[in-house]
A protein has these predicted regions:
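Hydrophobic small-molecule pocket/channel-lining residues, especially in calycin-type beta-barrels
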Residues: 1-160
Length: 160
């Protein structure tokens, strides 16, 4: 199924699992576009909240060993039934272009366009392995409009 046909559930409870406090184990590539680059691991702590009767979700994440923090604002479009995920971080002070998509069979896929080090990239976020006490997120970039993907960041979340 393509990102254009993927839809969110009829009720906007998709991101309710993120509400609360989480310990996060990060694993990301040292070069986001090179699938042969080394992985680095580091911790984070995240706090998620629900807003607009489930139509919005917000989380703040602190990366204590990296010296930065970020936030994600997720907004549910009741007309299109899709989520738009907006990321910002303290390093840049900039709101990155959103990734858009939804959940199907417990897996969320979200796509968007951005640049990385001056190169245009297609961006994919995947949420999977969602339980009451854990979840997995991953990010991938494509430089060939989705023909191939380099998964460059994993987060494993464990509820505090």
């Amino acid at each position: 199924m393509t990102s254009s046909t993927r839809t969110a559930s009829p009720v906007s409870t998709d991101f309710d699992f993120l509400v609360g406090e989480w310990d996060v184990t990060n694993r990301r590539r040292t070069d986001f576009l090179d699938e042969a680059s080394e992985w680095e691991e580091f911790p984070a702590v995240s706090h998620g909240t629900r807003h607009f009767d489930g139509g919005a979700n917000f989380d703040e994440i602190e990366f204590p060993t990296k010296g930065f923090a970020g936030l994600t604002l997720r907004l549910f479009d009741r007309e299109t039934r899709l989520w738009a995920l907006h990321w910002a971080d303290r390093r840049t002070g900039r709101l990155f272009p959103p990734v858009v998509g939804g959940f199907e069979d417990g897996r969320g896929e979200f796509y968007g366009d951005d640049t990385h080090e001056g190169k245009p990239v297609r961006v994919r976020f995947i949420w999977s392995g969602i339980t009451a006490d854990s979840a997995h997120w991953e990010q991938a970039f494509s430089v060939d409009d989705g023909g191939t993907w380099v998964t460059n960041w994993h987060m494993d979340l464990t509820r505090r």
